[in-house]
């Protein structure tokens, strides 16, 4: 009743302070249309003006709430990591989810033991909750356990704390400051602890501090010894700032200790050595890696392998080229074993260059390695190009392995037996492509020539006879190089008599060259007339050799006659042939023939050039010089 009176008096006071000017004559009505609370409540009468059923026919309904039926709808779909973690598998009560972050972390620090905290940190590491991890650890170490004693972390738990600080951008100095208090908890830093510090140094490229820390780890020993990751971080750090020598020293230490290098560090080392031209250093590193079983599987990328091979071939480093081809062979093998298979094929031009480098460096291993990877790349689907076979023949010839050289020649002839005759003759010419084999056959004079001839003769009488005109032509030309006309002529006759073969144009050219070299121009002319009479078509080299035979005999006029015949046959004289002719005309003081040579040079638009330097040497008065010296 008192409250009712207080309300009535308050209303009357409001009426006195704020009268209604519009209804001053009328009695004052209460603002509320509802009775006082002490009376029984009445149900409000529903107004037909606000009935939603009246508007359903004229308005479009809203779409359903998208959050219904999908508990994951509230998560931020723009972030791969949800902001609200799931505690379905944790020991945290579900009531903590609605608390503020700080009280929740404080409550967790009071309820979780070390093992539970380790499990939670593992979950938070997966979700990258570094800030919560750092905050919870700092609160947890200041809390008491269930026995009322301060919580003490072990090294694994502390490493989680270090990782959280590292991921939050802590500097190397901050990381060192965080490692120092580990002694207060009776915890010794292990290798993983120092590796986290090294990662911070790696980001800041602090090489000197990293080297000191690495030395400290080596001195501490036991659980603090550096591992593979430690050396990778330090080596990669030095390569990143361009300190390649220091990186090589650390890598040398790691390899001597038997540590395993990562593929990235090995690739960076290879790239650095190749870029600076330190191929010998790279060979040494590769050999040390191959000596350790754990590092045998290291292999640069396919593109880098090609680059290594190119640089090694340019510098004629046969060992490095062999290792590059070995790496490529690994890639080809891995690609074939993969499902689906990945096809790798080496460039055949690179193999040819490798064989040429093997010939220059006399490396048998590079010859075998180059040919092996070429066969692996071709996969038996087609034969190698003639240039590859010829490069292989020349490589074995430079090594002095004539047996394998002639075996490769037999492979070339078998692979291209169905080719056109002109193509085969040009491909197997002893004057051009097979000339290194000719030089190898005549290296020791008649001793080597006779040995090769008897081997070919025995092969022609075997179960699978091998008869080759190209091989015999090499012997004929080799005899001509040693001025052994008798052996050259006997070998030429043996082509048809002993081997049952027909001499080709290269056979006649080699014999003609042998006669011309010993100044038997008449016999050389007879050889030319003989081959023309039996229907063998001479080539441009035949005429050039006949010109040389006349010039050796100091007969420029006859040589010019041969040149005229050469032009009539449809060939053009070479610049070298015309220069030889002019030189002989000058020395013989034959101005008439010299003018004809100049006319031929103008006709075929050949620039002869001057021979002042040759003439100076030719006109030196050596007898006067001796008289002055005496």
Curated annotation (Swiss-Prot):
Q: Which domain of life is it from?
A: Eukaryota
Record-given protein name: Pentatricopeptide repeat-containing protein At1g26460, mitochondrial
Which organism encodes this protein? Arabidopsis thaliana
- Is the Repeat keyword given for this protein? yes
Record-linked Pfam families: PPR_2, PPR_3
Q: Where is this region: Disordered?
A: 42-79
Q: Where are the PPR repeats?
A: 154-189, 190-224, 227-261, 468-503, 504-538, 539-573
Q: Which UniProt keywords apply?
A: Mitochondrion, Repeat, Transit peptide
Q: Does the keyword DNA-binding apply?
A: no
